[in-house]
Amino acid sequence: MAGNIREKLDDVIRRYKNVTDLVYNNSGIMSRFENTGTVSVVQARNLGAVGVAARASGLKRDVRASHPFQAYTAMQYSPSSLETGDVLARGYLRKLEVDLSYSVIMNLLEGFQGPGAEVSPKPDYHMKFRTDTLAVSLTEGWRGEISHCILTDAKGDVLASRIKDPSVHNWTMLALAVRGAEISDFPLCNKSFNLSYCGHDL
């Protein structure tokens, strides 16, 4: 199984590299991306930016490093980051993250013995939650930090549940990135952040 995963992943990375080589070796694209839609590290910090948008501005914020879980507890995970905070940084950082993810997966496959007799235990749908409790969880999604908050009542039933999408923080970054820019810069900036429209309302 591990060999099959490696083979498929190598093929994906090879094809992905073909695309990124074309993009990042093209002087016309590079000149269009550089210094477009810049957001400083100070602005990113003040807005509570997360994910690629934060790390492209030099704010090295990543839940996998700050709150490691599962396999991340056994490795010294250090997220990639850049400092220019422009369209180029946000795009190129995604390439660096793909390279890093490839490395992480390959390292994990070294000790992979295949699935056990039971891949995943059957969920206990009748499990009772702790009473009068606030639970918070964090996960690094592909856009950045996702937080889940659940509040239980005196009987252990869910009283309230809230999910915060990373786009809640980063939409304001996009507004800063396009401030004073040409109309033609908007599509580049918008897609360099690649935010969720519905996620802003969660």
Over which residues does each language-model region extend?
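Active-site bordering "gate/hinge" segments
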Residues: 1-202
